[in-house]
UniProtKB/Swiss-Prot annotation:
Homology family: Belongs to the peptidase S1 family. Snake venom subfamily.
Alphabetized PANTHER family for the sequence: KALLIKREIN-1, KALLIKREIN-RELATED
Descriptive protein name: Snake venom serine protease serpentokallikrein-2
Swiss-Prot/TrEMBL GO biological process terms: proteolysis
PROSITE patterns in the cross-refs: TRYPSIN_DOM, TRYPSIN_HIS, TRYPSIN_SER
Enzyme class, UniProt record, top EC level: hydrolase
Subunit-structure text: Monomer.
Signal peptide boundaries: 1-18
Record has Disulfide bond as a keyword: yes
SMART domains: Tryp_SPc
């Protein structure tokens, strides 16, 4: 069974805030308040996702995070404790590969959002650069988000959690998930022993490998963080021409096949 890593949250938000868990994304630690100025929190239709600010006006997330009444929060660390840098935006435009529904668990799970107003850089808001080179198998990668910190029950943290995982050969994921095609625009990442993973509510957030923004949280095993069940991440590098074309105003640009 696989899990799209988005999470219905509003009905459980109050309970989650009240809980104090020593469980560590899953298997990680509380992110340092200064290490994620590019990380955004996306709410829509009673669900939550993550996302990545790539310049003052654009956010990159997963296509399956699309929905109505979307709100995007930037400069956030604690959900409960506001800071002077926190900003709220809504989408001005959304862009997808072909259409908002033309994606699969292994292809085109990517959405580019133009904010209704640009944000200014500050101590807690700053974009993350797009990758300058392709990802390399064996890289140590950082995941982060406000998703559930328990693989078996929904427990949302007040602050984002961070963990290090490894970029694995795509064939590792093909062996686990037989529905995957021979090739795709998807990265395979995780810890084969289990215990560390992105999970529900982390969808759309970044996979940062050797300091470069290489992936977007997409889907994985259910429950999360199980041995030999790594996660799948949309390959950002493979979509660079599409991303840059859209930002430059070329709406005719197409995603890679």
């Amino acid at each position: 069974m696989v899990l799209i890593r988005v999470l219905a949250n509003l009905l459980i938000l109050q309970l989650s805030y009240a809980q104090k868990s020593s469980e560590l994304v899953i298997g990680g630690d509380e992110c340092n308040i200064n290490e994620h100025p590019f990380l955004v929190l996306v709410y829509y239709d009673d669900y939550q996702c993550g996302g990545t600010l790539i310049n003052e006006e654009w956010v990159l997330t997963a296509a399956h995070c699309n929905g109505e009444n979307m709100e995007i929060y930037l400069g956030m660390h604690s959900k409960k404790v506001p800071n002077k840098d926190r900003r709220r935006r809504v989408p001005k435009e959304k862009f997808f590969c072909d259409s908002s529904k033309n994606y699969t668990k292994w292809n085109k799970d990517i959405m580019l959002i133009r904010l209704n107003r640009p944000v200014r850089k500050s101590a807690h808001i700053a974009p993350l650069s797009l990758p300058s080179s392709p990802p390399s198998v064996g890289s140590v990668c950082r995941i982060m988000g406000w998703g559930t910190i328990s693989p078996t029950k929904v427990t949302l943290p007040d602050v984002p959690r961070c963990a290090n995982i490894n970029l694995l050969d795509y064939e590792v994921c093909r062996a686990v998930y037989p529905e995957l095609p021979a090739t795709s625009r998807t990265l395979c990442a995780g810890i084969l022993e289990g215990g560390k993973d992105s999970c529900g509510g982390d969808s759309g957030g970044p996979l940062i490998c050797n300091g470069q923004f290489q992936g977007i949280v997409s889907w994985g095993g259910d429950p999360c963080a199980q041995p030999h069940e790594p996660g799948l991440y949309t390959n950002v590098f493979d979509h660079l021409d599409w991303i840059k074309g859209i930002i430059a105003g070329n709406t005719d640009v197409t995603c890679p096949l």
